[in-house]
């Protein structure tokens, strides 16, 4: 992903404030509520019967933290996202059979959750930079599918 110096500063500046557990759990929870068909990949997580059940589910929160921790790793390797996410791409393609469109949807949920948590700090320019990053990560995760 090519980011200008200003975009990199916006991304890294905001990311330094992010609570990975809180934002990750909320972003994954939002994905499962807004796009309920994605729940089929998480049947082992127990009760996903309502928005409250999803958002309060400890397994959703734990996996959301794991997802955002991995995303954070990608922020350290913006010039090599495909390499950084190669193993995860293979896992999601070959073993889990996740529709790669879901990566884009989750990226959008991450952006929405960041906007929700950081409001005025997450202005249009910061959002534009994060949209580039989540698109790059989604593309890297979908790489094995091509």
From Swiss-Prot:
Highest rank taxon of the organism = Eukaryota
Q: Which UniProt keywords apply?
A: Acetylation, Heme, Iron, Metal-binding, Oxygen transport, Phosphoprotein, S-nitrosylation, Transport
Q: Please give the CDD domains that the UniProt record associates with this protein.
A: Hb-beta-like (cd08925)
User: Where are the N-acetylvaline residues found in this chain?
Assistant: 1
What family is reported?
Belongs to the globin family.
> Its quaternary structure?
Heterotetramer of two alpha chains and two beta chains.
Role of this protein: Involved in oxygen transport from the lung to the various peripheral tissues.
Protein name per UniProt: Hemoglobin subunit beta
Which classification does the entry list for the species?
Eukaryota, Metazoa, Chordata, Craniata, Vertebrata
